[in-house]
UniProtKB/Swiss-Prot annotation:
It comes from the Bacteria. One of its GO terms (cellular component) is cytosolic large ribosomal subunit. This is Large ribosomal subunit protein uL6. Keywords: Ribonucleoprotein, Ribosomal protein, RNA-binding, rRNA-binding. It holds the Pfam family Ribosomal_L6. It comes from Corynebacterium jeikeium (strain K411). This protein binds to the 23S rRNA, and is important in its secondary structure. It is located near the subunit interface in the base of the L7/L12 stalk, and near the tRNA binding site of the peptidyltransferase center. The keyword Ribosomal protein applies.
Length: 178
């Protein structure tokens, strides 16, 4: 069995689970999330735990088993604690500011870049170069962070760009003159 999939998922107090066929809905203090579980995988609530099981040991079912358990676990974590990704901007003249609920970046382009906050995502800015993305859906928070990072990827020669907090950029040595 999958080491990830066979571990039961603890359901903390204040979280309600609604299983309707292949759809799992999780309600908690921070909001509601729902996810469709792939067809051969079943989710059952046993007391204060959720058990994810598969019908047989076919290769596809084994691969979906751990995935399904992780999706359910991430939903429970999201509605109880939420997810936050902190990011930093490096570079002369690069900055970020909050415009209403949206982020406005100055990244060396001829125009400012505006990132709109989708439903369920909140932005926070700390100074001109640090900001955070928060929400209850781990996939959505990570995707927004990746999209923002893609606006100005780190330059390996000068170290300029947008990066995750604590991320180390591998620097390259530039050309040497004659």
């Amino acid at each position: 069995m999958s080491r990830v999939g066979k571990a039961p998922v603890a359901v903390p107090s204040g979280v309600t689970i609604n299983i309707n066929g292949q759809s799992v809905e999780v309600k908690g203090p921070k909001g509601t999330l729902s996810q469709d579980i792939p067809a051969p995988i079943t989710v059952a609530q046993e007391g204060e735990e959720l058990v994810v099981s598969r019908p047989d040991d076919h290769r596809k079912n084994r691969s979906l088993h751990g995935l399904s358990r992780s999706l359910v676990f991430n939903m429970i974590e999201g509605v109880t604690k939420g997810y936050t990704i902190n990011m930093e901007i490096f570079g002369v003249g690069y900055r970020v500011q909050l415009k209403g609920k949206n982020l406005e970046f100055a990244l060396g382009y001829s125009h400012p870049v505006l990132i709109e906050a989708p439903e369920g995502i909140t932005f926070a800015v700390d100074g001109n170069t640090k900001f955070s993305i928060a929400g209850i859906d781990k996939q959505q928070v990570g995707q927004i962070a990746a999209n923002i990072r893609r606006l100005r990827k780190d330059d390996p020669y000068k170290g300029k760009g947008i990066r995750y907090e604590g991320e180390q950029v591998r620097r390259k040595v530039g050309k040497t003159g004659k």
